[in-house]
């Protein structure tokens, strides 16, 4: 069983993540995790924090000489800004007279619409939003990307690779029918300002971000994660919570600012006739069973089908709007403008990297659940044995 947990606050000393159930033999280094975190900071339209934020990675346990040992893997992502926040975010009590001189310690009593601020204050009984936003912040996703790197490395050694890309920013979208990126395209994707695989569309996206910046606005968009090399049969149809698409949807909806998820052609299929919505099963010229298309996105009946997995997540515009939205100052009860701090105009490219990490974690869990193995070599043998024993009459090949 693979499970994971994160802890820490946005301006605390560090974020910490633990992932358990990773087999021995996964090749993993601090630099690989750092590279993944650097990808999370990419993207045109990011705020000032990305310019000086450096993720200091420390692997605390579970790895020796670049190889996982079979125990829980613990990763710390240090906060280089901690000295500025040491007294304000200290775990132990700090004298009131010391805090009184700290401008950063001013109570945040004007909750931001679209954030967890107001409801979090209601739920936990806080009189200001600082305790809420510190944990609710998307900064926490740095830990998920770190843990997702562990999962990705595990999957990669089994021949399963992931790639994410941006398919829309606001109303600017990649035209239907354009080629999908493959793992070999990751470097080129990361070099694109918005991690878009279509150059012409990327240029239009940049213009959209520039226009929003001038108007004091923020933008959302849609990202897509693709997984190549999956065997058929991950997930199950027997219970709702074991369905692979259900688990992927939950994981992606758990990312800050994600408001919608679709697998394959998703919502588009709702407007089609049944004969144009599904993937017919035929034999190719070599007699192998194939599907004529991949509208299902690589999942049928809650199970992977051995084709490319394709899942999308829709991100709303960032709620910290420079123009500042209307709110109520809870300390006075009067109308006010919401608290504003540095923020991004568009963080959709980063959302793609986070989504990729979450998909990796779900798939790694599904692989471990289906095939087991205390070592990567054992897992690989189990997968081979499973595939070798699929009856010839049911043998298929991905699109």
From Swiss-Prot:
Disulfide bonds: none annotated. It comes from the Bacteria. NADP(+) binds at residues 40, 46. Keywords: Amino-acid biosynthesis, Aromatic amino acid biosynthesis, FAD, Flavoprotein, FMN, Lyase, NADP. FMN binds at residues 135-137, 256-257, 301, 316-320, 342. One of its GO terms (cellular component) is cytosol. One of its GO terms (molecular function) is chorismate synthase activity. Reduced FMN (FMNH(2)). Pfam families: Chorismate_synt. It catalyses: 5-O-(1-carboxyvinyl)-3-phosphoshikimate = chorismate + phosphate. Homotetramer. This reaction introduces a second double bond into the aromatic ring system. HAMAP family: Chorismate_synth. This is Chorismate synthase.
